[in-house]
Swiss-Prot record:
One of its GO terms (biological process) is intracellular signal transduction. Component of a probable ECS E3 ubiquitin-protein ligase complex that contains the Elongin BC complex. Residues 374-422 form the SOCS box domain. The gene is wsb1. This is WD repeat and SOCS box-containing protein 1. It comes from the Eukaryota. SMART domains: SOCS, SOCS_box, WD40. Probable substrate-recognition component of a SCF-like ECS (Elongin-Cullin-SOCS-box protein) E3 ubiquitin-protein ligase complex which mediates the ubiquitination and subsequent proteasomal degradation of target proteins. It comes from Xenopus tropicalis (Western clawed frog).
Length: 422
């Protein structure tokens, strides 16, 4: 069994450049259980990076400062990694909300975390007779942490203070995701087989319970327009939900083992799912078809072997902001960078005991967490998107597949816009 197809020479695949690492301090008496870094996340504005260090601790670090430290170390070795885009993002933050480092004790093992950001709201001329304990401003940045005891804690990122304690799940909160429209709607996925929808602008009111999973729910992700939610879990489950009606749209069939991670492309036209069956599938979520398959074991395993302990479980997947690159992390101690127009990785990086990965806000860096509670960072593949692809993304942000198919356009353009051709 091999990690790459026969037509690919592993030695010719480029190695991603490591730019830094954040190591969790340990003591000789510390137990290994509970040290896992189950999740890493970047703030939507690029101001913060957060990771679970294990043993109840979440670390919040200003990303620009962290990147400068990496750059300083790399410059000493003759490599310049200055990132102007992140620097500009952080310079826009007001002095009042200048990022500072926080260490948060969540009170229990942290399995998931997510950043949530509010947006400016239109001022209503009507008299508001509602009362809320918390009134979030237009520059609010929150961190949600999902715990082993089923609780969700909401923190103010700028102060590190606890704001809300959400209690309704009965098992581990395995994943969290905020609606990207600034509504501060939070969805949680749990081992209790449910997804729960919370309204943080209504003091964390639990709005809805989404039922349908027969086993653990591992991960959930909003589409960029917040209209659709994907949830994945044990038993090969991939579900799509309408977040206006809170109903299931469809189930996606194709995986042969537990599905543990999912993420939409920036234009919402594609959905990537990672499974223990050694595969990452890229779907068209609007019609439920598989467009691309990225294998991590060759020759491809049979359904019976893929459904068991095959040694190539894919643990995490992340979509870059360019809509072209995908990162995956598997049990063979490799991080892979894929391009959706190629069936093999364009770059790889060694990583032992990896559990999770996420692209930075601008896609220039990939972060990954490990069983030891550490976080590692790589420079991502350099690629200039074609004008055609940028136009496609602009169109797909406002039109789903069914709407595109109704356009009076040539077949070749239709296939390009629906990602059937690259």
């Amino acid at each position: 069994m091999a990690s790459f197809p026969d037509f690919v020479n592993e030695n010719e695949i480029a190695r991603s450049r490591t730019i830094g690492e954040l190591i969790t301090p340990t003591s000789p008496f510390e137990q290994k259980y509970g040290r896992e870094n189950w999740t890493v996340a970047f703030a939507p504005d690029g101001s913060y990076f957060a990771w679970s260090q294990g043993h109840r601790i979440v670390k919040l670090v200003p990303w620009s400062r962290c990147l400068k430290n990496f750059t300083a170390c790399s410059t000493k070795n003759g490599v310049n990694l200055t990132n102007g885009r992140l620097s500009r993002q952080n310079s826009d933050l007001g002095q009042r909300n200048k990022p500072i480092e926080h260490t948060i004790d969540c009170g229990d093992i942290v399995w998931s975390l997510a950043f949530g950001s509010s947006v400016p709201e239109k001022q209503s001329r009507c008299v508001n007779i509602e009362w809320h304990r918390f009134k979030f401003g237009q520059d609010q940045l929150l961190l949600a942490t999902g715990l082993s005891n089923g609780r969700i804690k909401i923190w103010d990122v700028y102060t590190g203070k606890l704001l809300l304690n959400l209690m309704d799940h009965t098992e581990v909160v395995r994943d969290l995701t905020f609606a990207p429209d600034g509504s501060l709607i939070l969805v949680s996925a749990s081992r209790d087989k449910t997804l729960r929808v919370w309204d943080l602008k209504d003091d964390g009111n639990m709005m809805k319970v989404l039922r349908g999973h027969q086993n653990w729910v591992y991960c959930c992700a909003f589409s960029p327009d917040s209209s659709m939610l994907c949830s994945v879990g044990a038993g090969k489950a991939v579900f799509l939900w309408d977040m206006d009606k809170y109903t299931m749209i469809r189930k996606l069939d194709g995986h042969y083992n537990d599905v543990v991670a999912c993420e939409f492309s920036p234009d919402g036209a594609l959905l990537a799912t990672a499974s223990y069956d050694t595969r990452v599938y890229v779907w068209d979520p609007h019609i439920g078809s598989i467009l691309f398959e990225f294998g991590h074991l060759f020759p491809p395993p049979t359904p019976i072997f893929a459904g068991g302990d095959n040694g190539r479980w894919v643990k995490s997947v992340s979509f870059s902001h360019d809509g072209v690159h995908i990162a995956s992390l598997a049990d063979d101690n490799l991080v892979r960078f894929w391009r959706i127009d190629k069936s093999y990785p364009v770059e790889v990086a060694p990583l032992s005991k990896g559990l999770c990965c996420a692209f930075s806000t601008d896609g220039s860096v990939l972060a990954a967490g490990t069983q030891d509670g550490n976080a590692y960072f790589w420079s991502t593949p350099k690629y200039v998107s074609s004008l055609q692809h940028l136009c496609r993304m602009a169109i797909r942000r406002v039109m789903n597949t069914n709407e595109v198919k109704k356009l009076p356009i040539p077949q070749k353009i239709m296939e390009f816009l629906t990602y059937q051709t690259m």
